[in-house]
Amino acid sequence: MRAVDLIQKKRDGQELTSSEIQWLVEGYVAGTVPDYQMSAFAMAVYFKGMTTREISDLTMNMVKTGQEFDLSAIEGIKVDKHSTGGVGDKVTLILAPLVASFDVPVAKMSGRGLGHTGGTIDKLESIKGFQVERSQDDFIKQVQNIGVSVIGQSDQLVKADKLLYALRDVTATVDTIPLIASSVMSKKIAAGADAILLDVTVGEGAFMKTVDEARELAQTMVNLGKAVGRKTVAVITDMSQPLGRAIGNRLEILEALEILQGKGREDISHFICELAQIMLSLANVEKTVEEVRQHLENGQALKKFEAMVLAQGGDLEDLYRPVTVDYVVEIPAQEDGVIEALPAMEFGLFAMRLGAGRAVKTDALDYETGIVFEKKVGESVKKGEIVAKVYANGKISPELVTDFQKYVKIKMSDETLKTREIIEIIS
């Protein structure tokens, strides 16, 4: 078998056999298929796509290139959740302990942020002492003991994906559904959970720009999960504006704590309760959204989060401290009206300029910096009223303030704009 023949076959729109896909994946990890040929194959997939069977074969062969976590020692149905990424996405910080507070074990591996999108692991590392690198044994013991753990992805997990993702990143082949689906699901399958909730974001701040694209990706991943016996549900969610009020690692921890105390904004609190209801249902625990919400209001979810922080070496006193920055700049509205748009991509990149995100993987983060919105889409505002606060450790230039104000779209209208977080559920 030769890589060039498989590249040509896919370039011409033909279907690869299971053995051909296995040979290609194994050869790439072993180094016998070089980067330049794998990048050509990825580009062929970008233009010609893959069948459902090909994607399934690719995914399972990728799983076999690394360690597979065995969570069978944990009693009950283990649930996991994945988001395709967004801005201000602190959902896991609240959702994992909330679901665990119903005695459903949550064993989750999360990633780091890159570009305009944030990463759960970076947010947790903003807590003094919090350890995200844990052995498989420690991970399992923690879930057995307190019901929840969120750790960084093991380097030993799905080696093919690590290699292929780095290649796709520099060859303009990131945004192709077969390769996104196989990347996400190979890691979720290898992580060992019995049931998976997929949060497929769509809109200005997401990889998927249209609902049709998001639906295709969601259905592909749900089919992959079901094919290997994992209960899988996907929700298509709106990422046209930042999620919640805060963007930035430490700021998002503080917002998560507000929500875990039942004090968060109604829109994000309700959204997370809806996601928790779906995750609980995957574990055969049927609750109403209001029953789920009670665990935010009565402190049970917060206790789980605090227990996880302590179990992973975090400092509870540091957990609740306010951010410490050199400058806090208030951004006023430039006119009366209704907030029509807060483009998630623009504000994600703005936060990155403050040090809250990475332009490249080697960039150091400033955990304290970021943005807190006082107004969100659909809310009325008067000229001069504060729309947001910018937290920075370097002086903020007038040009930066002007950029921020330019991104805030205000509509001259008395009409109240409706926003929705969950657009569609696919199971």
What are these regions (language model features)?
Residues 92, 110, 117-122, 154, ...:
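Short acidic, glycine/serine/threonine-rich loops at helix termini
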Residues 77-100, 104-116:
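Glycine/serine-rich anion-binding loops at beta->alpha junctions
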Residues 5, 10, 15-17, 28, ...:
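Well-ordered secondary-structure scaffolds
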Residues 109, 143, 151-153, 184, ...:
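Short beta-strand segments
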Residues 144-193:
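Phosphate/diphosphate-binding glycine-rich loops and adjacent basic-rich segments that engage nucleotide
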Residues 1-88, 307-311, 426-427:
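Acidic, glycine/proline-rich low-complexity segments that act as flexible tails and inter-domain linkers
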Residues 123-149, 219-225, 229:
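A glycine-rich helix N-cap at a beta->alpha junction
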Residues 47-48, 93-107, 187-192, 227-228, ...:
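Alpha-helix C-terminal capping segments
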